[in-house]
A protein has these predicted regions:
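Non-ligating segments of multi-cofactor redox enzymes
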Residues: 2-256, 274, 279-407
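Short linker/helix segments within small regulatory modules
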Residues: 255-267
Length: 407
């Protein structure tokens, strides 16, 4: 027995020494590097505009929605090539673009950081049906036109490159704002998608419930060999990785079950890697996840926040708002109308709860307590009434625009 006890003590000593070396090894602060990378996105934007102002011509803005024009008309644009580059990069490395170079992510993370600075941690909502908005939007943008083309027996268009004479499709342009919304609409889009959604619905809800490009990247990510992987000998299942994940990925459950993060919602911001107390997580290459995440307990691994009836109400309101605001006065862009649809849908469910429940909250605001309406609750009711009237007016305008165009 004595030799066995001595061997066990020696094993404990070896493990303790290894753990001490792991603990004392300096950690990489990926958050600072990511903040720098995201900040450079807007620096590049400013330099792009400055180059146009100085020279009179510049590279056309890289708009990912130009993929639709390429698929429909065969016109190769800068935005199409950029999207191809991102998809192929995601196929190999994973979803790094979303958290390291997306201009909307800059605003979302900035808002979340500012809220934390004042002690506010907005709780992300968990919805079944809203999860379908990004993939269905991507299907509508990129796949549905091809189905219509096949139905009408039209062949795929010949690839071609246009000059600036057409006014919207050239690689180089003398009109930087040719396809972009007006500055006021851009500011409104940034405020709604980058700030309002974070405060009201939680961190990175635009990525989860709106972004169609994220749906494409998540599909490509399933095939990527580059993933967050775990050293099972070091992992103690403490849950720190899940706690620090701002995309609400259940990291500790994935790595326990699969040895890697298989959820395609993982944006590779590497917060879990830098915060792991045992340094058990690493970004490495290996077998792709494929569709392993579909075998788990849903996107969040937690109960959803809305009943089936509430989800149905939210879906109807979402579609109504989307159709009412998209293209309103030839100004409101598609992504902004999607975001507004999600927000107003949640507002509508909240308003319904005010009539049926004794305790109601929205983000950090307590709207109703012990059956009594609070001051924020009263303000919400007034705001919701005004918002409902505005949506109804917008729907009226869009209906007459649509019927007028058909005549």
């Amino acid at each position: 027995m004595a030799p066995d006890r001595g061997r066990r003590r020696a094993d404990r000593r070896v493990l303790t020494d290894r753990d001490r070396k792991t603990r004392d090894r300096p950690r990489r602060n990926y958050a600072r590097w990511r903040a720098l990378s995201l900040s450079l996105v807007y620096v590049v934007f400013a330099l792009h505009i400055l180059h146009w102002k100085i020279t009179g011509k510049t590279l056309a803005p890289l708009e990912l929605n130009e993929v639709m024009y390429t698929l429909e008309l065969g016109v190769i644009t800068a935005g199409f090539l950029f999207m191809c580059f991102l998809v192929f990069g995601t196929l190999f490395f994973g979803r790094f673009f979303c958290s390291w170079a997306c201009h909307i992510m800059v605003l979302q993370d900035l808002c979340a950081w500012l809220l934390r600075r004042v002690g506010i941690r907005a709780k992300p909502i968990r919805s079944r049906l809203l999860l379908w908005v990004p993939p269905l939007t991507a299907f509508y943008m990129f796949v549905w036109p091809q189905i219509i083309r096949a139905w009408r027996n039209k062949g795929f268009p010949t690839f071609q490159m246009w000059t600036d004479a057409e006014g919207w499709a050239s690689f180089v342009t003398d009109n930087f704002w040719r396809n972009l919304p007006t500055p006021w609409i851009i500011v409104l889009t940034f405020l709604v998608c980058g700030f309002a959604m974070v405060y009201l619905l939680g961190s990175r809800t635009f990525c989860v419930y709106v972004c169609p490009y994220g749906a494409v990247f998540s599909l490509a990510d399933r095939l990527s060999p580059g993933r967050i992987r775990v050293d099972r000998d070091k992992c103690q299942q403490c849950g720190t990785c899940t706690e620090v994940c701002t995309t609400a990925v259940r990291v500790h459950e994935d790595v326990k079950r699969y040895g890697m993060v298989v959820n395609p919602a993982c944006l590779k911001d590497l917060d879990c890697v830098s915060h792991c107390p045992q340094q058990a997580l690493r970004y490495r290459f290996g077998w792709p996840a494929l569709f392993k995440s579909d075998k788990g307990g849903g996107r969040f691994g937690l109960p959803y926040d809305f009943s089936i009836a509430e989800e149905a109400l939210m879906s109807v309101v979402f579609l109504t708002v989307l159709l009412s605001f998209r293209g309103l006065y030839s100004r409101v862009p598609f992504l902004l109308s999607l975001a507004l649809g999600v927000i107003v849908g949640v507002f509508c469910v909240t308003a319904a709860r005010l009539m049926t429940r004794s305790e109601v909250s929205l983000s950090t605001l307590h709207l109703k307590r012990a059956g009594r309406l609070t001051l924020p609750g009263g303000a919400f009711r007034v705001f919701f009434a005004v918002l409902t009237a505005f949506v109804a007016h917008s729907a009226f305008v869009r209906y007459h625009e649509y019927t007028g165009l058909r005549q």
